[in-house]
Amino acid sequence: MVKTPLISVISQEEKEKNRGSVEFQVLCFTKKIDQISSHLKLHRKDYLSQRGLHKILGKRQRLLSYLSKKNRVRYKELINRLNIRESKTR
């Protein structure tokens, strides 16, 4: 698996202060999702990695829905910075 450097969306100071914040957790999940997606492009039949990807996607989706309920402005900023599509409301 080739690791590619990602542009830091959150500054280094914010990383040190807010490791438990929703934004930081979503950023970490997004990095993992990108890494696993690139792995799955090479290894299409790696079903264990597919399962892990689905679990991480679900965790990120739950965090994003929590953030959208609590603070819509922070949610909009985060999805714009990370280039994530806005989830469909049911």
From Swiss-Prot:
Any single GO molecular-function term of the entry would be: structural constituent of ribosome
Q: Which InterPro entries match?
A: Ribosomal_uS15 (IPR000589), Ribosomal_uS15_bac-type (IPR005290), uS15_NS1_RNA-bd_sf (IPR009068)
Return one Gene Ontology term, BP aspect.
translation
What is a single cellular component term in the Gene Ontology annotation? ribosome
Can you name the source organism? Pelargonium hortorum
Q: Does the keyword Chloroplast apply?
A: yes
Instruction: Tell me how this protein assembles.
Output: Part of the 30S ribosomal subunit.
Alphabetically ordered keywords of this record: Chloroplast, Plastid, Ribonucleoprotein, Ribosomal protein
Q: Where in the cell is it found?
A: Plastid, Chloroplast
Q: Which HAMAP family match?
A: Ribosomal_uS15_B
Query: Where does this chain mainly localize?
Result: plastid
UniProt record similarity statement: Belongs to the universal ribosomal protein uS15 family.
Protein name, per record: Small ribosomal subunit protein uS15c
